[in-house]
Amino acid sequence: MSTGTGAWAPNVFSADGLTASTVTAAGAALAAEAARFAALGWMPGTAGNLSITLDRDPLRLAVTASGLDKGELTSNDIVLVDGNGDWTGAGAVGAGADDGLTESLGLARRPSAEAGLHARIARVTGAGAGIHVHALTAVRAGHAWPEGVVLQDLEMLKGIGHSAHGERVVIPVVQNHQDMQVLGDDFERVYAGRTDSVGEVPALIVANHGIYAWGADLRQARWHLELTEALLQIALATR
């Protein structure tokens, strides 16, 4: 499956949908990826968050829990959230079929603050997974080019779905905001989705904060993040 196909994309963690085994496996995958990025220094302390899309109708995501060391997560350290990024467990407003899973699996109940933006990205782009880290290069690039980082004629652009030559790719930059509705609106304003002739841009820099990247699944989201970070390093080094 490819990323950025739009809201109709079937990118979900498992065709089985929202089940105990699917949620447990998703939690383990998120914990492993979080440890990877913590080791790189991209998720210092409790910073950063990751998500996996579990279902689309209605939209349900597993998001890493708030306030936990991202290098020490377990498969239970996730929160099930809806299309607004709100917890869907027992007692939550509009709770759905996932009520019992939070209790039976001992899942967390407080999602990361940016869960709302993860949900917005999953809905708008059709992504199956999203990653948000506090990588220094992305922050530096957002400071250097607040209107967006222009990349072209770089080989690694192929890794994020673009041509290595003759194509101008812009990694969008938005201002940081604590209100995820505002930040989500800004994301939609600058999002460059796929067209018949060019691929989407699967990354977003939030100024003075960090970077989001997404993909059809967690592995592709990781590739997009790592490649975008490397491309930003080149842009800064050659300006």
Could you describe each region identified by the protein language model?
Residues 2-239:
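Glycine-rich flexible loops
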